[in-house]
Amino acid sequence: MVEVFKTNVENIEYARLLLRKLMAQYPNYHINFDLQDCDRILRVEGNQVESMRIIEVVSGNGFDCQVLE
């Protein structure tokens, strides 16, 4: 399953920080950012992606995050 999120992460350093935090909690997920996309995309791939938990981690670090419809 792949879930795509729209974020407001613009800086590569913040993206790396969030990736470290997300990978610490979800080591079996494949996670990456596409900061060149206008929606600052966060892609998460895993057997069962916990969208609300991903949003909580990103939001808890001061960024907007929502599932891209």
Where are these regions (language model features)?
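Short amphipathic alpha-helix segments
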Residues: 9-25
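Gly/Ser-centered flexible loop/linker motifs
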Residues: 27-30
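Conserved short beta-strand edge segments in small beta-sheet-based binding/regulatory domains
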Residues: 32-33, 62-69
